[in-house]
Amino acid sequence: MYLVSLSRLLPLLLALLLPLQARAAALVTIVDGAASAIDGSRALVVAEGLKLGNDTIVRTTAATTLVRLEWPDGTVADLGPDTQAMVNPGGLVRGGSAPALYLLRGWAKLASLGSAGHPGLVAPRVDVQAFKGALVVMAGADETWVFAEAGGAPLLERDLRPASSLALKNGEVYVRLAAAKGSVAPRPTPAQMQRVPRGFRDALPLRAAAFKDKAVTAKTAAAPTYADLRDWLVGETALRRPFPRRFAALARDGAFRAGLVEHLARHPEWEPLLFPERFTKPAAAPR
């Protein structure tokens, strides 16, 4: 009986794992300005030719013009200034596929430059689902903005009850202010277009072939502080759940640990790592 049950469960388990296995590492092909990548306890300087695995956090500065990520299927994500994004976020598989990015804040331009459709991205207020074409997305504290530069895309407005979905058409712009329901206009205003990062305004070709068979040794960057990661650590539960394992080495730093302890109520999944004695069963009394 047990073997029969296991044989029935195995295909389901494989299906759940498939989206994570199928999404290849992203390749950095353009770096115009400073950027860093946080891969577990490692902090790296982002450089052209660097491969970024699942759940790697990329951070650009206010002075960064563009960081381009390419996947083998010809899909791309360009990151603009003052942006934080997670590559291939494994905790956010939806509809049998994982998004290319979780955009915590800042600017991203997504495009499908090959035959494959783009898997989209997730931001705090919107889920941009799989599409063909090119989209510009901005995620801010009080505003979310999606412009269908070429083609269209299905959008899901997150954290609304009842759930709200819409189909963004070519040329349209979607704007959502804070947690209110968003609106769609037939085209962006000149003021909106002026906000688009200048690095997004030119059509850039795929460059992955230039890095074929080239090994890039990543330079180490300064280890992230609690303040650097705070917005991630107190973010969505699906993203936070693996962080105690992924960032365990960082908790050995006194200042980082102090930040975790101070804000433990915002990320309680860290408690077993910080205070393992609270989860140890008391020894049985002698008889």
Language-model-derived ranges and their functions:
Residues 1-6:
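N-terminal secretory signal peptides that target proteins for export/translocation
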Residues 8-19:
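Bacterial N-terminal signal peptides
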Residues 24-173, 178-262:
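Flexible, surface-exposed loop/linker segments and immediately adjacent secondary-structure boundaries
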Residues 246-287:
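C-terminal non-catalytic accessory extensions
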